C-alpha cells in the first residue's frame, strides 16, 4: 500500500503512477475537503458538488485535477486507487508545523486570535490518530478501490467556537 500524502499537483500523481502501475496493490491519495463548494449543511457527503470555480484556491483546483485523473484511471484500467479527503488534521507530529501552535501561542500571550468574517463559518477537524485508523481500514481493502471517502471528526465547530475550545483547554478566557 502506498499512502500518498505528498502529491499536490498532477505531475506528482502521474510520476508515482508511472513508477508503480502494475506493481502496486493499493494507492491511497490524500486529497482535501477543500475541493467542495460552500455549504450551510454539514456533514458534506462525498457526492457533494466540487468547486471548480475561480473562487477555488489553486490547491483545491489541483486536488480536483488529481482526483479526476485517478478516478478516470481506475475506470479505464482498474488501477487500485482510493481517495481520502481530509479536513483539517490536528494532533502530534502534524506535518503542517505551527498550525495549532500559532493559535495557542497567541492565546497564551493574551494576543487576539484573528478570525475571518463573523467567526460563524462551520468546519470539522479530525485527530491524526482517528484519521490514521481510517487509513488502516482502507489498506488493501478491494471494496475501497475506486471510492472516495471524507475523513474527518464527527463534531462541527464554528471558527469562533474552535478558538473558544482551545482557550478552554488552556484554562484561559479569550
Per-segment meaning from a language model:
Residues 97-103, 116-140, 146-147, 161:
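Substrate-positioning beta->alpha
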Residues 9, 34-35, 88-90, 120-121, ...:
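Short, solvent-exposed loop/turn segments at secondary-structure junctions
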Residues 3, 28, 82-84, 149:
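Hydrophobic/aromatic beta-strand patches that form the interior of the parallel beta-sheet core
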Amino acid at each position: 500500500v502506498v499512502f500518498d500524502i505528498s502529491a499536490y499537483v498532477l505531475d506528482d500523481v502521474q510520476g508515482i503512477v508511472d513508477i508503480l502501475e502494475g506493481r502496486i496493490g493499493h494507492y491511497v491519495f490524500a486529497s482535501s475537503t477543500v475541493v467542495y463548494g460552500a455549504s450551510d449543511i454539514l456533514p458534506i457527503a462525498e457526492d457533494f458538488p466540487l468547486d471548480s470555480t475561480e473562487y477555488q484556491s489553486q490547491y483545491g483546483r489541483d486536488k480536483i485535477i488529481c482526483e479526476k485523473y485517478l478516478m478516470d484511471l481506475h475506470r479505464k484500467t482498474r488501477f487500485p486507487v482510493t481517495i481520502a479527503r481530509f479536513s483539517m488534521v490536528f494532533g502530534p507530529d502534524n506535518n503542517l508545523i505551527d498550525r495549532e501552535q500559532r493559535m495557542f501561542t497567541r492565546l497564551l500571550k493574551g494576543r487576539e486570535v484573528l478570525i475571518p468574517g463573523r467567526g460563524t463559518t462551520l468546519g470539522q477537524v479530525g485527530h491524526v490518530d482517528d484519521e490514521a485508523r481510517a487509513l488502516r481500514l482502507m489498506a488493501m481493502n478491494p471494496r475501497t478501490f475506486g471510492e472516495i471517502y471524507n475523513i474527518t471528526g464527527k463534531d462541527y465547530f464554528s471558527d469562533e467556537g474552535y478558538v473558544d475550545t482551545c482557550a478552554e483547554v488552556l484554562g484561559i478566557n479569550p
